[in-house]
Regions:
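S-adenosylmethionine
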Residues: 1-224
Length: 224
């Protein structure tokens, strides 16, 4: 049950973020996936399950030793296999990957419906520090993404500075980066989703999607 870790409760938005990366295209058995900011393990467990089904291998990274322990527990309880490492995502000592998930540290404003008190714990100056970190994590992940690979940059925030702002800045700096249509991928996963905006990135909303306000983007690295 939930107390033993055999069952886990996860918002649908978080599930869709993980599934967007795993199902953007069919996976090959030789693929290696990375969850860059994997603790405490909710999305990592779902990704590991998807990787296991497709025959891919997965590495789950978490900079915080405490959260890395929770990550290991989440995977162990689920009976899933993934190599857990504890490194700073901005300075990785790892190889190249076919798919990378970046669930970047953020303000968490997208989860206000579940944690309304968190609005009083955030300050405007927090935003600048977080967007710098988010951009650095995205740049680091890009260096470890194989040509032809796909990266998911997601946040539990609807704030443009943490979402489209970070993605647009990355695309402007990297000519080998191409934004994929994340909406098209999600529409193939859930028939209940209705595209609420005319762009390739996804911003889910509690009042229209009955999820946390999760932002989801998919970026591929061009070959050649």
């Amino acid at each position: 049950d939930v107390r033993t870790g055999a069952l886990r409760v996860q918002d649908q938005g978080s599930q869709l973020a993980a599934l967007a990366l795993s199902r953007v295209r069919p996976a090959a058995k030789s693929e290696i996936w990375l969850d860059l900011c994997a603790g405490p393990g909710g999305k990592a467990a779902l990704l590991a399950a998807e990787a296991q089904v497709s025959g891919a291998n997965m590495v789950a990274n978490e900079v915080s030793p405490h959260r890395a322990k929770l990550l290991e527990q989440a995977l162990d309880f689920s009976g899933l296999k993934a190599e857990v490492v504890c490194q700073d995502g901005r300075d990785l000592n790892l190889g190249q990957f076919d798919r990378i998930m970046i669930d970047a540290p953020c303000t968490g404003l997208g989860a206000l419906r579940r944690r309304p008190e968190s609005r009083w714990r955030k300050k405007p100056e927090d935003l600048k520090e977080l967007t710098v970190l988010q951009s650095e994590l995205l740049a680091s992940a890009w260096e470890h993404l194989k040509p032809g690979g796909v990266l998911a940059y997601v946040t539990c925030s609807p704030h443009p500075a943490e979402t489209t702002g970070v993605v647009s800045s990355h695309l402007a700096k990297h000519k080998d980066a191409e934004l994929l249509d994340a909406w098209a991928t999600l529409e193939g996963i859930s028939e209940e989703l209705i595209r609420n905006e005319n762009r390739k990135t996804v911003q889910l909303w509690p009042h229209t999607n009955d999820t946390d306000a999760m932002f989801i983007s998919l970026i591929t690295k061009k070959v050649g």
